[in-house]
Amino acid sequence: MLPSTGRHRRTRTLSIAAAVACAAGAGGVYLGLSTGGAQAASAAVTVSTTAQLEAAVKNATAGTVIQVRGGTYYPAATLKSTANGTSSAPITLRAHGAEKVRIDGSKLPAGSWLAGIYGDHWTVQDLAFVNSPAQGFVATSSVGGVFRNLITADNGDSGFTLRGDGTTGNLVQNLDSHGNYDPAGHGQNADGIAVKFGSGTGNRITGARLYNNSDDGVDLWQFSSPVTIEHSWAFGNGENRWNDAAFEGNGNGFKLGGGGASVAHVVNNNAAWDNTLHGFTENSNTGALALNRNTAYANAQSGFYFATGTARLGKNLAVGDKGGAAKLGSSTVSAGNNWDSGIATPPFRSTDATTAYGARRADGSLPATTFLTTGSTTIGSTMD
């Protein structure tokens, strides 16, 4: 117990009615309890204007829940926060109920990100980040983030980015990232999702659709800790859809390294098709990458390119890739793949990708499809 100061400390209580009145100017209702200022108040706010959204993100603290009403919002500056939530009181930014929310960067200054989070334990879900002059959504050195059911589309650089040292324990679930293109770099930088220039364990990408981006679907350039990627699709990346005469987009589905990092990323049950370079590539990563039950189809170069490292490939399926099923180095371990001796290639139920572009299921997971499915329980992606 702290020694008495000789003064009687008076606890101040704010009535619910007063709290509502105070919060009205910020466009929402905040309800919280505080004990003499010793404990941070939890807060809930519903916003319906761009100014309210900007203020709510700027002023968020642990436990804040920001619910955004349906509509399109045009920030005048990057939505930015350095605030930290906690594992028990995350900061939440989400759509209100099932309402559709677009956060549009078309009024931002040149070179601006649309959203930038520099704190820990954020949950961001059910929002679209579109038309940024640069990156759509960036989380820097974040811990324990949950980024769910997001759309990052038609931005001027990568749609979704995790970066920085200390990027730890983040979940990216059910992301749709498409149409991102960087005109300043002639398409060589804009990926669907980039986890790059950093480190930190426990980061996972699941249920993503990464398509029609100018560079790669996934890019893990210079990220020095293992990332897990599962149940995700990368397709149509690297094609010059912007009539750029000096276009330089790469066009890998899953680029799993580069820049000197040697990392054992884990890549399970994914699919890559119609990319302008490789379906899956080490991209000079010499680490013990593990790839199991992935499918590559109709990519312009190799389905699987692992020519220099120590990757372990098992039960993968490659069909119709113009540069061949796989290009492997002497240190690559390959077993149970359809290019290995004695392994049959099961037929696809469908090669019509139309349903892969369809609406996601009610829980946000990938759409049901027979595209590239085989019914096999031993080889290739299950496409779900």
Regions found by a protein language model. Give the residues of each.
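N-terminal export and membrane-targeting signals
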Residues: 2-20
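C-terminal region of N-terminal signal peptides and the immediate post-cleavage residues
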Residues: 6-8, 26-44
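Post-signal peptide N-terminal regions of Sec-secreted extracellular proteins
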Residues: 41-44, 58, 84, 118, ...
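Acidic Gly/Asp/Thr-rich repetitive segments characteristic of extracellular carbohydrate-active
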Residues: 41-79
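Acidic, glycine- and Ser/Thr-rich low-complexity intrinsically disordered tracts
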Residues: 43, 193, 309-384
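Right-handed parallel beta-helix/beta-spiral solenoid domain characteristic of secreted/periplasmic
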Residues: 46-48, 70-76, 83-134, 181
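Extracellular beta-strand/beta-solenoid scaffold signature
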Residues: 78-81, 105-115, 131-138, 154-164, ...
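Right-handed parallel beta-helix
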Residues: 90, 96-99, 120-131, 143-156, ...
